[in-house]
């Protein structure tokens, strides 16, 4: 039973598309738009007896056949869909109109529309009269016959088709049985206009035995298996299209050079075009190659027939369609397996083009003579290409972000002009590069280098180039040095991780570091899902005479959704800097782990407010103002924490996440002021006491949930000015070496004048026997002391705590928690 789709009582625009649906208008003035969007073989009915209604036939609509009654018309479209308009004599037929695009067509009455369709007068009664076959809408007019620009589907029988002045399309299939419609005895004459034969090689190859004349475009699709099509010197062809092939397609027998289009060919499926009898091959022979969303591992070969040594010299590649285009290689050869004939490779279009295999040009370099030119001057989408080593290549970029890979072959006669955008030149296969000895580099921002495995990588003379960034790619040898020590002011450096090895010492410096505000930016590009955390590491970052170091934590993006998270992270094992370094700024969306060495004695600022994911930082020097990011941050002070340091959280204040500070202290004093700590917004503060007793003040500690104390040295600690609600952890530090306490712990509140003051001690013993053996001391002004034991405190497990509470002077002592199995 057909589905009825009712309009509203207003003026509606309806676009019939679905099978077995009756579209019915109500009282408004309704518009029904008929277009090629109607599903193939769909059965659609239109009924509307009220209002001033119209049928719009969109430009390009192809009607294979029609039948007219006195008050109804049946239109069979070229895709087999059948549209029946009941009460047709009450409709206006607007040819070429389309309200959805604001296009106005030509209005015709029902009888006028019938006349245009080849029915001179409408029948009466129940008589049906057929209109002219193969009618197409062209602009605001409708004409009959193949010559009007129709689409014709070939039959399994004999087809003798003659076109007219329009742009006609003929659809055929090389199939089996009833699916074989392109037969050797068929005859197609496209006539005038720009005509197309669309051929689907679904079950076999095309041998070229159909008689085809006056057809300008051969559009061929390979499916089911790799297919071949031999055009047998078919004359008049100007364009060859590989139309959405799902398998390899090889086309031969072209007697002249044609434009080649690849339209959404399946990734990994290849296109090979052979031009025959090309006596006209010669200097300057060119081909236009249009790519519409081609695949990254597809191969494209344009070649002459066997024995040909000349071929395509200039290739003009355009990127059209809705997405970027890629190819494994694009080659122009004299013959199959022969030498390249290419001298120029041009790219245009708004979409990015990527070709992974180097563009090969004819001949080899001879002195200063240019072998090949790659020009992306007309490209706005950017290119990612490679040049063959040993050829003198000129590369010109466009307005997009372009990259050109010269591998080992960038010599003094090569040149790169990146144009606008952020452009990259890539070099590899050497241990060092002196930029002053290489080819010309202009309008190019990034130099990417990967040194030969087995040694370090060095870039010199950066001060002589207009480049602004060096990106080092780690080679395949572990702990190798990376060096760039003569950078210009404003230059930056990137480290790209791409395997299980990691760089050793990275030495960076400025050519002129005599200023008092020199800065350097280092971007770390880690691998997502690296084999191990250390695989995104740098053993040592060595800098000198740099006042400000900017670190950006990033990821090598291949899929667009990578992020270095909890088990990963960019790591700098040691930042070795001299006394010039005063500021480190860190930013990024990927986890960062770093240690600042003891050499950086002048460091005063560590600003990680730009970090949106977790960080772990270790400081070996003191008197540093630290700002944390919005992730879960861990800040290790070592033995340097005093009142001269300050820590401020950058915004992570949720209940399920936490920042943490760790520090080892000895001899801090609230009397001298060294123990007056300045910490804001950090949830956990882990303190380990060694050597000498300390006293610290929490008066300037805000936003914390716990101060956790650990020590096995029987060293006393006094914590003063504790705000209400702040828990004191005893043996509750996160680090395994600090999850114990053996000593006297004295705690007092900032305000003990209330009537219900409480201090809570949390026992978090998780180590070996008797790890917590502490004496607790509180003032009598505190009404209650609560001792909460963690759930793993059970004597049977050799895991318990012993407390001396004789100096807890509170009126009420509450003990709770512990393991449920432990009873005493």
Predicted segment positions?
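Solvent-exposed, low-complexity segments and loops of surface/extracellular structural proteins
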Residues: 1-824
């Amino acid at each position: 039973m057909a589905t009825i789709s009712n309009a509203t009582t207003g003026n509606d625009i309806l676009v019939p598309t679905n099978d077995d649906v009756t579209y019915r208008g109500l009282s408004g003035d309704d518009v029904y738009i008929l277009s090629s969007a109607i599903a193939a073989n769909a059965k659609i009915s239109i009924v509307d007896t009220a209002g001033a209604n119209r049928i719009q036939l969109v430009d390009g609509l192809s009607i294979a056949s029609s039948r007219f009654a006195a008050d109804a018309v049946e239109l069979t479209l070229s895709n087999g869909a059948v549209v029946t308009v009941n009460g047709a004599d009450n409709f206006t037929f607007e040819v070429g109109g389309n309200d959805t695009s604001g296009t106005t067509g030509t209005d015709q009455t029902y009888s006028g529309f019938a006349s245009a369709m080849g029915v001179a007068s409408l029948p009466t009664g129940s008589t049906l009269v057929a209109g002219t076959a193969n009618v197409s809408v062209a602009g605001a007019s409708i004409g009959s016959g193949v010559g009007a620009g129709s689409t014709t589907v070939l039959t399994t029988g004999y087809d003798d088709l003659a076109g007219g002045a329009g742009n006609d399309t003929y659809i055929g299939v090389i199939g089996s049985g009833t699916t074989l419609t392109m037969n050797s005895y068929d005859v197609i004459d496209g006539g005038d206009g720009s005509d197309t034969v669309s051929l689907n090689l679904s079950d076999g190859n095309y041998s070229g035995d159909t008689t085809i004349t006056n057809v300008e475009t051969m559009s061929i699709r390979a499916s089911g298996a790799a297919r071949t099509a031999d055009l047998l010197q078919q004359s008049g062809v100007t364009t060859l299209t590989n139309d959405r092939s799902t398998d390899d397609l090889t086309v031969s027998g072209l007697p002249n050079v044609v434009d080649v289009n690849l339209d959404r060919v399946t990734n990994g499926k290849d296109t090979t075009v052979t031009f025959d009898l090309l006596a006209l091959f010669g200097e300057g022979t060119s081909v236009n190659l249009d790519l519409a969303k081609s695949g990254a591992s597809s191969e494209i070969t344009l070649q002459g027939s066997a024995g040909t040594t000349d071929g395509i010299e200039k290739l003009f590649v355009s990127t059209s369609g809705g997405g970027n285009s890629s190819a494994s290689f694009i080659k122009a050869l004299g013959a199959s397996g022969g030498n390249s004939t290419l001298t120029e490779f041009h790219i245009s279009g708004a979409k990015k083009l990527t070709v992974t295999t180097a563009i090969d040009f004819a001949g080899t370099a001879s002195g200063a003579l240019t072998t090949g030119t790659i020009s992306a001057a007309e490209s706005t989408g950017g290119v990612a290409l490679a040049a063959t080593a040993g050829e003198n290549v000129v590369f010109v970029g466009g307005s997009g972000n372009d990259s050109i890979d010269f591998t080992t072959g960038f010599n003094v006669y090569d040149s790169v002009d990146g144009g606008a955008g952020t452009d990259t030149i890539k070099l590899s296969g050497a241990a060092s590069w002196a930029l002053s000895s290489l080819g010309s580099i202009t309008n190019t921002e990034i130099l990417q280098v990967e040194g030969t495995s087995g040694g370090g990588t060095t870039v010199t003379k950066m001060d002589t180039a207009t480049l602004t960034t060096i990106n080092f790619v780690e080679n395949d040898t572990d702990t190798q040095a990376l060096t760039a020590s003569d950078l210009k002011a404003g230059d930056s450096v990137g480290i790209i991780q791409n395997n299980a090895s990691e760089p050793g010492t990275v030495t960076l410096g400025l050519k002129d570091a005599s200023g008092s505000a020199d800065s350097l930016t280092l971007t770390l590009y880690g691998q997502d899902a690296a084999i191990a955390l250390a695989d995104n590491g740098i053993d040592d970052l060595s800098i000198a005479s740099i006042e400000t170091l900017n670190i950006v934590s990033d990821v090598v993006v291949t899929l667009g959704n990578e992020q270095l998270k909890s088990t990963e992270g960019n790591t700098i094992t040691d930042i070795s800097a001299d006394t010039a370094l005063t500021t480190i700024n860190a930013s990024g969306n990927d986890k960062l782990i770093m240690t600042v060495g003891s050499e950086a004695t002048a460091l005063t600022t560590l600003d990680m407010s730009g970090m949106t994911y977790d960080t772990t930082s270790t400081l070996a020097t003191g008197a540093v103002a630290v700002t944390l990011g919005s992730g879960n941050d861990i800040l290790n002070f070592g033995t340097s924490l005093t009142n001269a340091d300050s820590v401020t959280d950058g915004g992570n204040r949720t209940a399920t996440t936490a920042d943490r500070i760790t520090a080892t202290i000895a001899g801090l004093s609230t009397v001298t002021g060294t123990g007056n700590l300045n910490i804001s917004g950090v949830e956990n503060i882990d303190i380990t006491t060694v050597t000498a007793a300390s006293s610290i003040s929490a008066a300037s500690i805000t936003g914390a949930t716990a101060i956790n104390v650990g020590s096995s040295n029987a060293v006393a600690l006094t914590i003063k000015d504790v705000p209400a609600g702040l828990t004191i952890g005893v043996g509750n530090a996160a680090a395994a070496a600090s999850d114990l306490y053996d000593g006297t712990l004295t705690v007092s509140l900032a305000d003990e004048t209330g009537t219900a003051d409480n201090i809570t001690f949390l026992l978090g013993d998780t180590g070996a026997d008797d790890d917590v053996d502490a004496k607790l001391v509180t003032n009598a002004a505190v009404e209650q002391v609560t001792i909460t034991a963690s759930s793993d405190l059970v004597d049977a497990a050799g895991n318990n705590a012993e407390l001396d509470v004789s100096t807890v002077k509170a009126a009420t002592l509450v003990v709770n928690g512990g393991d449920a199995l432990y009873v005493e």
